[in-house]
Amino acid sequence: MINTLTSLRFIFAIMVFGAHCYVIDNVFNTHFFKEGFVGVSFFFVLRGFIIAYNYQEKLKDNKIDKRSFWVARIARIYPLHWLTLFIAAILGSYVIASGTLDWLKHFLASLTLTNAYIPKADYFFSFNSPSWSLCCEQLFYICFPFLIPLAKNYKYLLSVFGIVAILMVVGMYFTPEDEIKGFWYVNPITRFPDFIVGMLLFQLYERLKNKNITALQGSIIEISSIILFLIFYLYAADIPKVYRYSCYYWLPVAVILISFSLQKGIFSRILSNRFLVII
């Protein structure tokens, strides 16, 4: 267990919460709060890191098989998702449908966690709107075992990521403003590179975790990573939103995550506090 990452999850969860508070009070309608959606990128990158941390060696050494992995992960998603979906359907939560058949299409898409693949807000935000992130997680879990052979030699995985990243940046440039969210923010396919970043970070972590890094050096690394993140965060308003939804934050999020995963500095000690880990 890497306690610092557990504490970081709480911090970024607060940021995501703050990004939605502008609908409650206009005081939150500022760049500082609304940019908190970076927490989504952090969670997807973290997911790739943690899944690799917990399962990469087990799958590689055949201690568990693909089926057992899929059952274990998917079982964590669907029961609660279906419960909230049915409650949302009963309460009549947000869904735009022209009739019964259209309503059923929306419902089935949400039921099977395929709604986020359809780049229309009335689909990916229908019923329980945060479920789009579960669509992404489902894809991550399905694909992860097949990425293990690439992870054995991280250069292959890095090459795949590099090609995908270039294609993404080009695609983002040509995407109309009103289609950005559907194609680049909620779509599991285009959020998959976030997960790969996390997997790559785990390969780096494996090579660095036993390095002799002093508390002073670790603290400098952590402070530097925080400064880098703040620079990206505070000056993000000058960057087109399509990039900020994903690739713009890969570097600062990756640096934050790898710096604190090593648990070598003073800030890691603070984040390892039992209270912070619990919350």
Roles of regions detected by a PLM:
Residues 2-57, 77-84, 105, 109-115, ...:
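Functionally critical transmembrane alpha-helices in membrane proteins and complexes, commonly lining
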Residues 2-3, 28-40, 122-136, 175-197, ...:
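Interfacial loop-to-helix transition and helix-capping segments at the boundaries
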Residues 14-22, 90, 116, 163-175, ...:
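Aromatic-anchored segments of alpha-helical transmembrane domains
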Residues 37-40, 44, 57-93, 101-110, ...:
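Transmembrane alpha-helical segments and their boundary/interface "anchor" motifs
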Residues 49-57, 84, 88, 140, ...:
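Hydrophobic transmembrane alpha-helices
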Residues 61-66, 78, 103-104, 153-158, ...:
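Membrane-helix interface segments
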Residues 94, 195, 221-279:
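Alpha-helical transmembrane segments of multi-pass integral membrane proteins
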Residues 138-166, 202-221:
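Solvent-exposed interhelical
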